Amino acid sequence: MNAYTKQKIGIFGLGKTGISVYEELKNKYDLIVYDDLKAKRDIFEKLFGNKLITILSDSRWQDLDKIVLSPGVPLTHEVVRIAHHFNIPIISDIDLLFEKSKNLKFIAITGTNGKSTTAALISHILNSNGLDYTVAGNIGVPALQAKASKDGYVLELSSFQLDLVKIFTVKVAVLLNITPDHLDRYQDMNGYIAAKAKIFDRMDKDSYAVINIDNDYCRKIFLLLQREQLIKLIPFSVTKILNNGISIVDDKIHDNNLTYKLPLNKNLQGLHNCENIAASYAVSKIIGVESKKILESISSFQSLHHRMQYIGSINNISFYNDSKATNAISALQSIKALDNIYWLAGGIPKEGGIEGIKPYFNKIKKAYFYGQAKTMFANTAKNIIDCVICDNLEYAFNIAYKDAVSDNTEIKNILLAPSCSSYDQFKNFEERGELFIKLSKNVIGSNYLLSNLRIFD
């Protein structure tokens, strides 16, 4: 018998996470469920019927043993108020996974940017070297739907998920970076920083914190943990060589007193990916993988879709899909990594637009702005870079490709780094990225076919 036997549990939020929680707990406990969005309730009803769907005003929400909250639900929501008023604990799907897998190792990664790539890279390194780690969490696979693992889990955790965990404890925690984000959910930066720092809660002297000390907010957390002396600390940097820690400087990995050449990988370009590599290297060493094996695995890593994803090249034009770059800070990382850029950007703009990218406009050959942000972005870029206002991404791509073909520069890059959310023209950033991939592959394929047909002329 476990802690949840015969308990009454409410599941609030019926997206991917809520559905995974329901499938985990059904037939074991007395459940009720709800979501504010009718579309989500309709999907649940189609899958499982409407018997358990219970509106919040129903008194059963006041008589629960626990509420499992989906991470997208703000902590100011009425369901949270009900839980607090009636002393009902709120837990998360991450806690449920931890409870049933306590004998396994948990590696968790958080940060404003780079989480998914780092989680995938760590998993790739470990699994390429005879271990069995499953990657899940905010990366797109709900924790409770992740395949069973023999050795452990690599979890990408957002601040929203960290807000909810109560018992989850990790062997290795990674803090990549912190920059302003989600300030519509948190009162100020201090609230956002505090949420990120929760990744280190409940860790002990046998646990490791891997922290980017180049980032001001992360460095403050590192210094606080250093004073407390409760866990083992491994700092990393991509701006200076550390005597005790991991550094990547001048295309070399510095591991305390050892130095290795940084492997070349087109899928891991840019300073931001050096941070991801440094963190992944540190974690892999902690788990017990030899340095040489780590470097080999870094070389063979294939990037995640929509995250600075190299699609291919034709006629000295390379295509990069960074559809996941939904804000300027994220887009800036891919822009820093390339030159002679034909830049596709647009959608629903975030606060500040692309102002933060202006110092790097010299890397952009021409910009193609589309969607709701097109006029705003063009006003920021005018008189600095050549730009075109477009109706949609496909039109922007076609004009950009035509311009790149007529450019005699030796190396050219067509980059989708939207700096916006996608919801004005797409369901999500994945759909946006898939269109870019399709357009890129069509161009690469047709050019390859033409070049081969000319052999027979």
Swiss-Prot record:
The reaction(s) annotated as catalysed by this protein in its Swiss-Prot or TrEMBL entry are: UDP-N-acetyl-alpha-D-muramoyl-L-alanine + D-glutamate + ATP = UDP-N-acetyl-alpha-D-muramoyl-L-alanyl-D-glutamate + ADP + phosphate + H(+)
Root EC class? ligase
A GO CC annotation given for this chain? cytoplasm
Positions that bind ATP:
111-117
Q: Name one Pfam family in it.
A: MurD-like_N
Keyword set, alphabetical order? ATP-binding, Cell cycle, Cell division, Cell shape, Cell wall biogenesis/degradation, Cytoplasm, Ligase, Nucleotide-binding, Peptidoglycan synthesis
Q: What SUPFAM superfamilies would the database entry show?
A: MurCD N-terminal domain (SSF51984), MurD-like peptide ligases, catalytic domain (SSF53623), MurD-like peptide ligases, peptide-binding domain (SSF53244)
- EC number(s): the record gives 6.3.2.9
Query: From the UniProt record, which GO molecular function terms apply?
Result: ATP binding; tetrahydrofolylpolyglutamate synthase activity; UDP-N-acetylmuramoylalanine-D-glutamate ligase activity
Q: Which residues cross the membrane?
A: none
**Locations listed in the record:** Cytoplasm
Pathway the protein takes part in: Cell wall biogenesis; peptidoglycan biosynthesis
What is an annotated GO biological process for this record, any one?
A: peptidoglycan biosynthetic process
Q: What does this protein do?
A: Cell wall formation. Catalyzes the addition of glutamate to the nucleotide precursor UDP-N-acetylmuramoyl-L-alanine (UMA).
Query: Which PANTHER family does the protein's record reference?
Result: UDP-N-ACETYLMURAMOYLALANINE--D-GLUTAMATE LIGASE (PTHR43692:SF1)
Give the HAMAP family listed for this entry: MurD (MF_00639)
Q: Which family does it belong to?
A: Belongs to the MurCDEF family.
This one is known as: UDP-N-acetylmuramoylalanine--D-glutamate ligase
Give the organism the record lists.
Rickettsia typhi (strain ATCC VR-144 / Wilmington)
